[in-house]
UniProtKB/Swiss-Prot annotation:
Gene: cf50-1
Source organism phylogeny: Eukaryota, Amoebozoa, Evosea, Eumycetozoa, Dictyostelia
Native organism: Dictyostelium discoideum
EC class of the enzyme, as a word: hydrolase
Transmembrane segments: none
Biased composition (Low complexity): 236-292
Protein name: Counting factor 50
E.C. number(s) listed in UniProt: 3.2.1.17
Length: 303
């Protein structure tokens, strides 16, 4: 009888864990510029509305986010225990080539700063003057991802159905990594199959479904993973006027092909300081997908 009770308790714990994971599906992301201006009360508000935060740690022009330690600390103190980082690297940006050196520098800095994080997302999108030929770009992105993995980092890819082929052509050798895709359809679900089936991916890990909106007085992008049933939509997410692009630099023009691919997709905020402020082209085909089995909910990167 005791054995049966123990089995029942174990099964119950597993079911409860699954329920907690599925219901905790709302996330936000923002740039390094936005992250340094968030007050303690805003952090608390963001943590009460989301279970996950993704913070920019590297921009092609500005490189390593020197404030990342204090920003991650503020997120932890607010209650976030699922903290991801994203890095926008570009082959033509100073200090970004080769990709292996840029990733090694990034990981070394994170280790020196004692940063605890879950997943590192490699941001792949267009910006003015950031990239070379598609085949060279593909080699660069693959080198970045594989270098990060080789250093013991949990790594995924962020992109969209429009930005991916514009940047890396038909690259499909990274589909075993989690994919976070952008498609601005105001719909926290994975029902938009056509927008994440690119680059060899067939299922997503996370979706950026609203770009450059306002939550708790902070300019953010809205994302979801899991069921998405409790995530905000445009009718309920805004709390004041937006304060600017959630990520990406204010310098540069909207270069990411403003109407390529399907409407309302592409990343609104992750460009580098040297590239476009909205390099993900507000209307470029969406999509960051990635294998659902590697959604970045593990124990974090060991660096």
């Amino acid at each position: 009888m005791n054995k049966m009770n123990n089995i029942f308790l174990i099964i119950s714990s597993i079911i409860l864990s699954i329920v907690i994971f599925v219901s905790g599906e709302c996330a936000i992301d923002f740039s390094s510029e936005i992250s340094v201006g968030i007050s303690d009360s805003q952090w608390s508000c963001l943590a009460s509305n989301n279970q996950r935060v993704i913070i920019q740690v590297w921009s092609g022009g500005g490189q390593y986010n020197s404030n990342i330690s204090s920003v991650v600390s503020a997120a932890e103190q607010a209650g976030f225990d699922n903290i991801d980082l994203y890095a926008f690297l570009c082959s033509e940006c100073d200090g970004n080539y080769p990709a292996s050196s840029a990733i090694q520098s990034l990981v070394s800095s994170l280790k020196s700063d004692g940063i605890n994080f879950n997943m590192l997302w490699i941001d792949v999108e267009q910006c003015d003057g950031c990239w070379g030929a598609e085949s060279d770009n593909a080699d660069y992105v693959q080198e970045a991802v594989e270098t990060a993995q080789g250093l013991g980092v949990l790594v995924g890819v962020y992109s969209s159905e429009g930005e991916w082929p514009q940047t890396v052509g038909n690259l499909s050798t990274l589909s075993q990594y989690p994919l976070w895709y952008a498609h601005y359809d105001d719909n926290p679900s994975f029902s938009d199959t056509a927008f994440y089936e690119f680059g060899g991916w067939t299922s997503p890990a996370m979706k950026q479904y609203i770009g450059n909106t306002n939550q708790c007085g902070v300019s953010v992008d809205l994302d979801f993973y899991g069921s998405g049933s409790g995530c905000s939509t445009s009718s309920g997410s805004a709390s004041g006027s937006a304060s600017g692009s959630a990520s990406g630099s204010a310098s540069g023009s909207n270069s990411g092909s403003s109407n390529s691919g399907s409407s309302n997709s592409g990343s609104s905020n992750s460009g580098s300081n040297s590239g476009s402020s909205n390099s993900g082209s507000g209307n470029s085909g969406s999509s960051n997908s990635g294998s659902a089995s590697g959604s970045g909910t593990g124990s974090g990167s060991s660096i």
